[in-house]
Curated annotation (Swiss-Prot):
Residues 763-828 are annotated as: Disordered. Gene3D superfamilies: 3.40.50.140, Topoisomerase I, domain 2, Topoisomerase I, domain 3, Topoisomerase I, domain 4. Its EC number is 5.6.2.1. Keywords: DNA-binding, Isomerase, Topoisomerase. Releases the supercoiling and torsional tension of DNA introduced during the DNA replication and transcription by transiently cleaving and rejoining one strand of the DNA duplex. Introduces a single-strand break via transesterification at a target site in duplex DNA. The scissile phosphodiester is attacked by the catalytic tyrosine of the enzyme, resulting in the formation of a DNA-(5'-phosphotyrosyl)-enzyme intermediate and the expulsion of a 3'-OH DNA strand. The free DNA strand than undergoes passage around the unbroken strand thus removing DNA supercoils. GO terms for molecular function: DNA binding; DNA topoisomerase type I (single strand cut, ATP-independent) activity. This is DNA topoisomerase 3. GO terms for biological process: DNA recombination; DNA repair; DNA topological change. Belongs to the type IA topoisomerase family. It comes from the Eukaryota.
Length: 828
């Protein structure tokens, strides 16, 4: 019986290339439910079966995504802290439904499933996503995993002969990391986005955020963010440490204080016997520099007393070097530094070269080739290249081939990045990346370059000076690899004990210079050294902080943080957290690695990590005012609820928190304008009554009357129709001092020991009223009509007074309705 086999690759281009290799380019193509993911059908002998009916298709990266369940998706649905424990589910999103339908249809016709996903942890996770979809459609079928490092016939054939089972531990490790990132990212993103709505985190011609000027450039405004004030200010456990490296360098720049220093140098001219020319030699001071001018000048004068120089040492040594094989991180660093191609673009070009079968898998930490790798065969593939073909031929035909050096890293999954086929017709950055990878591979298989380094040390009056000359003795790998510099620096021959009088001795003043902004190569090195992300994700994290407008590249291709990026990092540092430091993320990555190795379970890692971040969230919530301290340096406050407010009085009443003057503002609503008090120093806003004339309350001596509870200046609200007034504390009105009260809260409801607080007096009046009502009822029962009339009159008068001015603490809701009914000219 003929076996039907469904094969699934990670990308359409990979499916097309692998199908072409297995079918010898004789596959027939048909459409799937997704117009981007076609299917190729052909016959092939595999798994000891002849003429199997093979169908090859693909997904496009992850087939499924995780998210919290529907009830927690609206931002107003819960406190962000609940997202640490909210139920989550992994589902196929709507845009991947066509892929799901194709897999379901094809697996029902298949006996075997072969998973051709990329051979890394992420690919393993995608393999299990494909497997889950297929198992939901069909209960029983065999499944295998194909492992390959390049899309070339030799590797694909080897993969077919060595099919294995997918690695579930690697997949679980990815699921764990994804859940951690989802919970932490969602909680802190909502937390900081919702709170920071109080600031205008946008830039326009009328309102440019404040900037700080470092020693050698301007910090970038967040000017590329064309948001409407509703942008998301995201947090990610990887993106924040990445941002932290950029901001840390920035703070080193802005905090840098230049210092003057002085250094000595000796200039001598001597005949070079080999060239017959006079060569100037500048000997540098072995002390390097002094920051004390007097001390430097004394030593300078000492040297001038007797300028004769004596050669005290001449050392010569050879240095040899050639590069180790290429890893993903080294490719990204070199491309950024030498080719000026960003890390994320580099990986896109490398992926394209890989799917074309031109290079090996571009995501690898390995910098050593396994024994038995046919390196000469790979070099032979390049013999026809017009640029380096002659060099490649010499390597294998003239016995110049040298087995590559071994580095220190091996991920046991993929070999170092190397060319797998000769390429012609490439152009632009794609060609640059291919050329670099190929030249690096040829350099690894070449002889070392040899340099002669000669250092001459002289003495003048006890002060030592030295100079080093360098000469290339053998080009070696440099012949094919122009990306390493050749630093020839000739000096004439000196003999130990030789004496001479220098041409001059100089005392030179210099000034220390601030460090430069961090480059992409330096950022990648910092991330790699601190285990932030993986070789497959580092470029993405760097791109993310650019997409979020936290950083931007300047004209020198260096990363400069925006006001937003600096403010976020500074806020969490004020809280005492190390969110921008690598420690927390490195611990997560280490735990995820342990899941892959079977040393920890998913539940163990989730429990410890989520609990740790939940505690940090609670502490952040308690110290949320740190955002105010950082953000008000760069941003103006936003108008509450997105409205446009105009200032009625710029310095109206006193703030009880900072003791400064608050602004009295109103929005533009002509029918019922909303009025607020706003403190520009504390970034606090207080709602005011919509009706009535509002003025500051002062004592008979003209002194502002402050609330004894919160120290905010009390305001008077007057009804212009009946000329009646009441008083409010703006703070207490919006945040009642006693939780049993609801806002708006007024002085006539307050029971504090204050001459404005009449709540106690009204309580007494209410108690008297209740006692009178009791007496009245008792008298009625006794048919005592003569004494009932005055009680009725007094009760009516007391009740009317009560409804007009107060609501008791014990009956707030009902009495407040009475108050509203009698004071219908006000809306509190």
């Amino acid at each position: 019986m003929t076996k039907r086999i469904l094969n699934v690759a990670e990308k359409p281009s990979a499916a097309k290339e692998i199908a072409a290799i297995l079918s010898n380019k004789r596959a027939t193509v048909r459409e799937g439910f997704s117009k981007y993911n076609k299917l190729w059908d052909f016959k092939y002998n595999i798994l000891n079966f002849n003429d199997c009916e093979m169908t090859f298709t693909s997904v496009t990266g992850h087939l499924m995504e995780i998210d919290v369940v529907e009830q927690f998706k609206p931002w107003a649905s819960c406190d962000p802290i609940q997202l640490f424990d909210a139920p989550i589910r992994k589902t196929v999103p709507s845009d991947k439904e066509p892929l799901k339908k194709t897999l379901e249809r094809e697996i029902k016709k298949a006996d075997i499933l072969i998973l051709w996903l990329d051979c890394d942890r992420e690919g393993e996770n995608i393999a299990f996503e494909v497997l889950e979809v297929c198992k939901n459609a069909k209960k029983k079928f065999e499944f295998y995993r194909a492992h390959f490092s390049a899309i070339i016939p030799r590797e694909i054939d080897r993969a077919c002969k060595n099919l294995a089972k997918p690695n579930e531990k690697d997949s679980i490790a990815v699921d764990t990391r994804m859940e951690i990132d989802l919970r932490i990212g969602a909680a802190f993103t909502r937390f900081q986005t919702l709170y920071l709505k109080k600031f205008k985190i946008i830039s326009n011609s009328d309102n440019q955020p404040k900037t700080t000027t470092p020693a050698n450039g301007n910090i970038l405004n967040n000017s590329n963010n064309n948001s409407s004030g509703k942008e998301i200010i995201s947090y990610g456990p990887c993106q924040f440490p990445t941002l932290g490296f950029v901001v840390e360098r920035y703070f080193r720049i802005v905090n840098f204080k230049p210092e003057d220093f002085w250094h000595l140098s000796v200039v001598h001219e001597k005949m070079d016997t080999s060239s017959g020319k006079m060569i100037p030699v500048t000997f540098s001071w072995c002390r390097n520099r002094l920051f004390d001018y007097t001390a430097a000048f004394i030593l300078y004068e000492k040297c001038l007393d007797n300028t004769e120089a004596t050669v005290v040492d001449v050392t010569s040594k050879e240095s040899r070097y050639r590069p180790v094989p290429l890893t993903t991180i080294e490719l990204q660093k070199a491309a950024s530094k030498k080719l000026r191609i960003s890390s994320v673009q580099t990986m896109q070009y490398a992926e394209e070269l890989y799917t074309k079968g031109l290079i090996s898998y571009p995501r690898t930490e390995t910098d050593s080739f396994q024994a038995g790798t046919d390196l000469k065969g790979l070099i032979g593939n390049q013999a026809s290249n017009p640029e380096w073909g002659a060099y490649a031929s010499r390597l294998i035909n003239n016995n110049q081939f040298v087995y590559p050096k071994s580095g220190k890293n091996n991920d046991n999954s993929h070999p170092p990045i190397h060319p797998t086929s000769s390429a012609t017709g490439l152009s632009g950055n794609l060609k640059k990346i291919y050329d670099f990878i190929t030249r690096r591979f040829l350099a690894c298989c070449s002889e070392e370059s040899v340099f002669a380094n000669t250092t001459v040390t002289i003495d003048i009056q006890g002060e030592r000076f030295s100079e080093t000359g360098t000469m290339v003795l053998k080009l070696g790998y440099l012949e094919v690899y122009p990306f390493d510099k050749r630093n020839d620096k000739l000096i004439p021959t000196y003999q130990k004990g030789e004496r001479f009088t220098p041409k001059r001795i100089d005392l030179t003043k210099g000034t220390t210079v601030a460090p430069h902004y961090i480059t992409e190569a330096e950022l990648l090195t910092a991330m790699d050294n601190n285990k932030i992300g993986t070789d497959a994700t580092m470029a993405t994290h760097i791109q993310t902080i650019q997409d979020r407008f936290y950083v931007k590249k300047n004209e020198s291709n260096q990363f400069v943080p925006s006001n937003l990026g600096v403010s976020l990092v500074a806020s969490y540092e004020l809280m005492g957290f190390e969110f921008s430091k690598p420690n927390l993320r490195a611990a997560i990555e280490a735990d995820v690695d342990k899941i892959s190795r079977g040393q920890k379970t998913k539940q163990e890692v989730l429990l410890s990590t989520i609990e740790k971040y939940k505690q940090l969230y609670q502490l952040a919530n308690q110290n949320i005012n740190c955002f105010d301290r950082s953000f008000r340096e760069y941003y103006e406050p936003a108008d509450p609820k997105g409205g446009e407010f105009r200032v009625l009085v710029s310095q109206f009443s006193r703030c009880g928190k900072c003791n400064g003057k608050m602004q009295y503002k109103s929005d533009q609503n002509p029918e019922a304008p909303k009025r607020i008090l706003f403190c520009p120093q504390c970034i606090d806003t207080f709602d005011l009554p919509k009706n009535g004339d509002i003025s500051q309350l002062v004592t008979s001596m003209g002194v502002p009357q402050n609330c004894p509870i919160c120290q905010y200046q009390v305001l008077s609200v007057r009804n212009p129709i009946n000329d009646k007034s009441y008083t409010i504390c703006p703070k207490c009105r919006n945040s009642p001092p006693d939780p049993i009260h609801k806002k708006p809260f007024h002085c006539f409801q307050c029971t504090f020991n204050c001459n404005l607080a009449t709540g106690n007096k009204q309580q007494q009046q209410q108690q008297q009223q209740q006692q009178q009502q009791t007496n009245y009822n008792r008298n009625n029962n006794n048919n005592n009509t003569n004494s009932a009339r005055p009680i009725t009159t007094r009760t009516t008068r007391t009740t009317t007074q009560h409804r007009t001015f107060t609501a008791s603490n014990n009956n707030f809701n009902n009495n407040n309705r009475n108050s509203d009914r009698n004071n219908n000219n006000f809306i509190f």
